[in-house]
């Protein structure tokens, strides 16, 4: 699963997920899966979608993951009273804004790419759309 090798601080504030995304263009591959909604993707969700795509294209072509879970999410254990400090880091998430390209693919026909991204999108909690590279 994806997570940073080391961070400056172990725990971070909750923060907000506002604004528009960076990385809105398909830059590595020919086809992409772009976020339409806003939300968070956990490392497990990113990996599950990647596996679904890899199986769908039968390991041909190339897949790029354009998001990285760099925000630690903490949780307190069950049945623990409030207070006594912030909980332990349980998992890592990537904050997603509308327009962000999540995955890219190349070396496969468009129909196969569409099918693979459809399977991947089913694993994700946010609304997505299929995009192709625009040549100027």
Curated annotation (Swiss-Prot):
InterPro entries: Ribosomal_uL16, Ribosomal_uL16_bact-type, Ribosomal_uL16_CS, Ribosomal_uL16_dom, Ribosomal_uL16_sf. GO terms for molecular function: rRNA binding; structural constituent of ribosome; tRNA binding. One of its GO terms (cellular component) is cytosolic large ribosomal subunit. Keywords: Ribonucleoprotein, Ribosomal protein, RNA-binding, rRNA-binding, tRNA-binding. Pfam families: Ribosomal_L16 (PF00252). One of its GO terms (biological process) is translation. NCBIfam families: rplP_bact. Binds 23S rRNA and is also seen to make contacts with the A and possibly P site tRNAs. Part of the 50S ribosomal subunit. Belongs to the universal ribosomal protein uL16 family. This is Large ribosomal subunit protein uL16. It comes from Erwinia tasmaniensis (strain DSM 17950 / CFBP 7177 / CIP 109463 / NCPPB 4357 / Et1/99).
